[in-house]
Amino acid sequence: MELLKQLSDNLIKRTDTRYLRYMYHQIPWSNRMTVLVGPRGVGKTTLLLQYIKLNLQMKDTLYVSAESIYFANHTLFETAMKFSQLGGKHLFIDEIHKYKGWATELKMIYDNLPTLQVVFTGSSVLDIYKGTADLSRRVLVFTMQGLSFREYIGMEKGIDIPVSTLEQIVNNEVVLPEEIEHPLALFHEYLCKGYYPFSKDEGYRMRLNQVVSMTLETDIPQYANYTVMVSRKLKELMQVIADSVPFKPNMSTIATTIKVDRNNLPDYFELMERAGLIAQLHESTGGVRGLGKVEKVYLDNTNLSFALSSSMPDIGNQRETFFFNQMRVNHAVFNSPISDFMIEDKTFEIGGKKKGQKQISEAKEGYIVKDDIETGMGNVIPLWAFGMNY
């Protein structure tokens, strides 16, 4: 325990707190048990350490990673109980999905150690509700995404820009500070390597490929009990998607291409989406049926397009991927039967600066979203502005 505490304290002391992500202010940190899930690489660990460093006393706090070798000979519950007996008040557990039987032991901690507050992180494929009904009533679940364009500017330039609502964006009310006279250069930089907080690291593209590989080879198979053979098929499927997006999925064709049972493909797509690798755009059916069929499949974010595509990503694909990625954090985004996207009653057509109004002429409330323009007018909105929504 002493060594575990020392490692925890050292990590906390080294944590950079200069920039705080959007999720930092959304989590009710005083809740007794909270889980933060999200794709690999989006900064969940850093967020925990920042909160500890800025708000808690280290003597009351323990941060552990569930994949630590320490847990080869110790249980989570045993560790939590000993820490609580020593006066500990706040336990932070990273990578909870790496610990077998995590749900049972967290329930034991909750029920038997009422003075101990627990915050833990997990993979986004982790289903906190699967087989853990008792735990799900005790824990608050938050999902964290990668950097918005707004956050990227904050991290890269140290410039704080307020969040803009969708109404402010479509009314062309997004105002950038004077330090950013021309946003397009930064925007194109973001599309290439701005979504993940480790964008400044050497070998960014290599690390991003490692994130994808670990998700497909470890996270998804571990959760779904897939064999090594299935994990290989997931990698093949990922490459097919990367080279084809955006596309309307034909399950029979894809199944033939990668030699899998077509009946398994919807499950593969769902898990890859939950893991933050792809995004599926549905038609809106409304009513009790909820989500309609999948109309298009995209990579989750534009950085993945640059990292995984075997050629230069299509510019139209980049534009649509960016819009879908940024807007679905706070909004339900659906396929438009006459254009590209729908949010509530608003229709959005995405294109370059020469894009015309024809596509949305019959829309109840239509907007043209243009890349390569700095400012908008009327129902013409610059694409980069949609990166200010979180």
Named regions from a protein language model:
Residues 40-41:
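Walker A (P-loop) phosphate-binding loop of P-loop NTPases
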Residues 92, 117-123, 143:
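Structural recognition of the conserved hydrophobic beta-strand(s) that form the central parallel beta-sheet
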Residues 1-17, 50, 54, 66, ...:
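A cross-kingdom feature that marks ATP-driven nucleic-acid transaction machinery
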Residues 58-90:
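Short glycine-rich substrate-engagement loop in P-loop NTPases that contacts/grips substrate
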Residues 36:
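Hydrophobic anchor at the beta1->P-loop junction of P-loop NTPases
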Residues 2-10, 123, 129-238:
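Interdomain motor-coupling "hinge/lid" segment immediately C-terminal to the ATP-binding subdomain
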